[in-house]
Amino acid sequence: LDEAINTAGELKFSLPLQKRLDSNIYYVLIPEFHGNDFLMFKIISEDVQKDRVEYSAVESAYDELKSYEYIKDIRPHQMNAAQMLQQVLKNTRWSLGYVEDTGIQSTTFYYVTILEAIQKIVDLFKVELTFTIQLDPVTQKITGRRVNLYQQQGRRTGKRFEYGSNLLTVTREEDSQNLVTALVGRGKGVQVSGQDTE
């Protein structure tokens, strides 16, 4: 699992060839590191080797939240992060999860995707974002999709990671996550007052 702050996580895993996933399986859930929820990943590639099958998957929430209709115009005024997030998630199947107390801010969401609005909230309040899934242990069905905002995940260890002269391998990866299938055209955005002038 490759995890970065406020970006889609990536999951790579492999199975023996005889345990290859059915072609109708598109998503994989793994337990969250802290808590009883799960992280959900969408399988984006399958690479069949001699005796193994390697899979690559990305966190599915990012794609889903980009696919909802655009927010045309919401102007939250003097709200905390939870209140803004609740407005943004109103027409989705996602809800508030754990959201830390934040100060209050004002902003504007104008012709942006749900995901762009969430990222604007994250930047505005300087918080860290995760998406979690709740699963019924008996029926194995998804019962909830949560958006969580933390002041800080994990802890600071003072350790530093670098790569340089002792590099052993380099891997080239191609990514089709930000593929655009539709565009929304907009005009100049001139504000018009109450009188209709011809």
At which residue positions do the language-model features occur?
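Acidic, small/polar-enriched beta strand-loop surface segments
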Residues: 153-198
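Surface-exposed cap/loop segments at beta↔alpha junctions
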Residues: 16-100
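Amphipathic, non-transmembrane alpha-helical segments in extracytoplasmic/periplasmic proteins
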Residues: 13, 57, 70-97, 108-135, ...
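A generic structural signal for beta-strand entry/edge sites
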Residues: 8-12, 49-54, 139-146
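Structured loops at beta-to-helix junctions and adjacent beta-edge loops in soluble globular domains
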Residues: 16, 58-60, 150-152, 186-188
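Short beta-strand/loop turn elements enriched in aromatics
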Residues: 1-6
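Short, conserved phosphate-binding/catalytic loop or strand-edge motifs used
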Residues: 94-107, 138-145
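Extended amphipathic alpha-helical segments with heptad-repeat/coiled-coil character used for oligomerization
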Residues: 127-160, 164-165, 177
